[in-house]
Curated annotation (Swiss-Prot):
Its EC number is 7.1.1.-. Belongs to the complex I 20 kDa subunit family. This is NADH-quinone oxidoreductase subunit B. NDH-1 is composed of 14 different subunits. Subunits NuoB, C, D, E, F, and G constitute the peripheral sector of the complex. [4Fe-4S] cluster binds at residues 52-53, 117, 147. The gene is nuoB. The lineage of its organism: Bacteria, Pseudomonadati, Pseudomonadota, Alphaproteobacteria, Candidatus Pelagibacterales. PANTHER family: NADH DEHYDROGENASE (PTHR11995), NADH DEHYDROGENASE [UBIQUINONE] IRON-SULFUR PROTEIN 7, MITOCHONDRIAL (PTHR11995:SF14). Keywords: 4Fe-4S, Cell inner membrane, Cell membrane, Iron, Iron-sulfur, Membrane, Metal-binding, NAD, Quinone, Translocase, Transport, Ubiquinone. Its main location: membrane. NDH-1 shuttles electrons from NADH, via FMN and iron-sulfur (Fe-S) centers, to quinones in the respiratory chain. Couples the redox reaction to proton translocation (for every two electrons transferred, four hydrogen ions are translocated across the cytoplasmic membrane), and thus conserves the redox energy in a proton gradient. Transmembrane segments: none annotated. It is a peripheral membrane protein. NCBIfam families: nuoB_fam, PRK06411.1.
Amino acid sequence: MNLENKNKEIPEEFKKLAEDFSKNGFITTSLDNLINWSRAGSLHWMTFGLACCAVEMMQTAMPRYDLERFGAAPRGSPRQSDVMIVAGTLTNKMAPALRKVYDQMPEPRYVISMGSCANGGGYYHYSYSVVRGCDKIVPVDIYVPGCPPSAEALLYGILQLQKKIRNKGSFER
């Protein structure tokens, strides 16, 4: 086995870490990077499924896409979750409940808006009873487009959220 050919496949960041470890016997990093890495790798999400997008959201957790392999596990309580996925049409009557559930989540908390209805009202945009985007009620971190968005689109949105968490300071939001 030729070791030089294998080293060409290793990203530069890992080469630097391996070099530091072989020289010193330990690796130094900032606490902020460690916290962000662990947060991004262990997202606990809860569903706020309001319409047909929730079916696609459930499909993402099934064996074909297996969201848990990316470190995202479902939780039944807002007090145990740090990501809320709002999927579907948000009505004026449901908006206070959404805000109440969001307020029960511990910090840091993130929101993914899934589908055209959650993003901006969608097909029902001009209805008197529909909120024109859940970002009017709670701050949204990631928007997943589509009507309904595919399971792959939601998976991509979660991966983008993990990337956003890794790149952001843990003590500022």
